[in-house]
């Protein structure tokens, strides 16, 4: 009987050791695949100012674009920016069609169950934008009103996680694929308020001729931190990105990129 137990324990140790080695090989192989390819495939929403957006000539620019280029230079890769359906970002990452999510991507507990995160590199808040002529001066006055929010955004998560702030006040919620489309409806009066990332709203309104027509209010949701979303198995890639971010911070290059886009 004792021999059988010992034999079983030996087999168990061998199996566990094999799983551990296989896991390490998968992590290393994924990095080697990326390294051999020479590019980092980056999933973005190309309408999210000032993080990733298109100029009139179609060129992709933004804070995250500049930061991703700087990080890729540090780790010896070329960035390959791919526009994705933002509501499908985690699926794209899991399926391997992209290597990272890098587009004002907020680290949350729910997302951390599916995605690994780099160290944070920027803070953000959720705000409410309304038309001044609507007579809505704070979020409490959204009772019975129509609220716009982007599908798959951290604002949509906050709406569900903290229902007393807005969800239980508003009459209904309209989901949008992009903030651009949401702002069109807000201007036209088809929605009464827009739940939106502060970095987007501040930049968008600062560059809009209609900025005096709108009011902004920081909402009582927890402050957020933007990070790079990485497949959980890609630990080597995560370490490489973190090392690059640390180096950019120490050399002052990250500060220069922040100042360029956020003055």
PLM regions: where:
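Periplasmic-binding protein-like
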Residues: 46, 123-130, 198, 206-246, ...
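Flexible hinge/capping segments at coil-to-helix
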Residues: 33, 130-147
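Extended ligand-binding regions for polar small-molecule ligands
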Residues: 25, 65-74, 140, 145-146, ...
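Ligand-binding clefts/hinges and TM-proximal coupling segments of bilobed small-molecule sensing domains
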Residues: 24-30, 36, 154-174, 212-217, ...
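Short helices/loops that flank or line small-molecule/ion binding pockets
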Residues: 82-83, 87-101, 114-116, 140-143, ...
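Extracytoplasmic small-molecule ligand-binding "clamshell" domains
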Residues: 28-104, 251
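A ligand-binding cleft/hinge motif common to bilobed small-molecule-binding domains
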Residues: 105-113, 158-161, 185-188, 192-222
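Ligand-binding cleft/hinge of the Venus flytrap
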Residues: 55, 68-77, 155-176, 205-210
């Amino acid at each position: 009987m004792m021999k059988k137990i010992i034999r079983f324990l030996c087999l168990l140790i061998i199996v566990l050791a094999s799983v551990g080695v296989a896991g390490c090989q998968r992590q290393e192989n994924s990095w080697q695949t990326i390294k051999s390819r020479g590019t980092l495939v980056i999933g973005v929403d190309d309408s999210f100012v000032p993080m990733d957006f298109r100029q009139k000539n179609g060129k992709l620019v933004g804070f995250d674009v500049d930061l991703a280029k700087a990080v890729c230079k540090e780790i010896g890769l070329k960035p390959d920016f791919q526009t994705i359906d933002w509501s499908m970002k985690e699926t794209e990452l899991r399926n391997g069609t992209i290597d990272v999510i890098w587009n004002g991507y907020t680290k949350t507990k729910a997302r951390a169950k599916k995605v690994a995160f780099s160290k944070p590199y920027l803070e953000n808040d959720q705000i409410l934008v309304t038309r001044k002529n609507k007579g809505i001066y704070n979020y409490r006055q959204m009772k019975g009103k129509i609220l716009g929010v982007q599908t798959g955004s951290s604002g949509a998560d906050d709406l569900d996680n903290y229902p007393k702030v807005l969800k239980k006040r508003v009459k209904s919620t309209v989901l949008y694929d992009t903030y651009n489309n949401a702002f069109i409806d807000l201007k036209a009066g088809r929605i009464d308020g827009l739940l939106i990332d502060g970095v987007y709203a501040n930049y968008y309104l600062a560059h809009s001729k209609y900025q005096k027509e709108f009011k902004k209010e920081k909402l009582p949701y927890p402050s957020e931190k933007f990070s790079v979303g990485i497949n959980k198995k890609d630990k080597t890639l995560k370490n490489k990105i973190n090392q690059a971010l640390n180096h950019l911070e120490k050399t002052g290059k990250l500060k220069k990129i922040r100042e360029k886009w956020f003055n």
